[in-house]
Amino acid sequence: MIQGIQITKAANDELLNSIWLLDSEKNEARCVAAATGYEADQVIAISDLGEYESREVAIETAPRIEGGQHLNVNVLKRETLEDAVAHPEKYPQLTIRVSGYAVRFNSLTPEQQRDVIARTFTETL
């Protein structure tokens, strides 16, 4: 478990008011901020802090990224894409976003075009 602390009293004056992240599982302390004597991100053994008093500092953990979501935004009507499938000559410049890159709709295979239409226009999220 990781705990954030600010040292309020210590035998070592360089620790006074410094902020640390303590990892009890690894028995490590990571310096977040200190006036002198310690660098930001410096890692030491918790025992190297010596005797001290502290107050807890709330920390926010970054969200875990597990898989994730992807969003392509195309501002157009379903009818426009369906008409582009039926009459590609009318839409030579129709460009859409697919997986983060721009592509001309007419350069896609018919299967890819149907997939884009199905993914772009849904009834619910």
From Swiss-Prot:
What keywords are annotated for this sequence in UniProt? Organic radical
Q: Name one GO cellular component term.
A: cytosol
Keyword Transcription regulation assigned to the entry: answer is no
Q: Which residues form the Glycine radical domain?
A: 5-125
Listed PROSITE patterns = GLY_RADICAL_1, GLY_RADICAL_2
One Gene Ontology MF term? formate C-acetyltransferase activity
Asked if the Swiss-Prot or TrEMBL record annotates the protein with the keyword Cell membrane, the reply is no
Disulphide bond pairs: none
Q: Which residues carry this modification: Glycine radical?
A: 100
Q: Which residues form a coiled coil?
A: none
Q: Which NCBIfam families match?
A: spare_glycyl
Tell me, in a sentence or two, what this protein's role is: Acts as a radical domain for damaged PFL and possibly other radical proteins.
Q: Which HAMAP family match?
A: GrcA (MF_00806)
**Family annotation (PANTHER family):** FORMATE ACETYLTRANSFERASE (PTHR30191), FORMATE ACETYLTRANSFERASE 1 (PTHR30191:SF0)
Q: What is this protein called?
A: Autonomous glycyl radical cofactor
Lineage summary: Bacteria, Pseudomonadati, Pseudomonadota, Gammaproteobacteria, Vibrionales
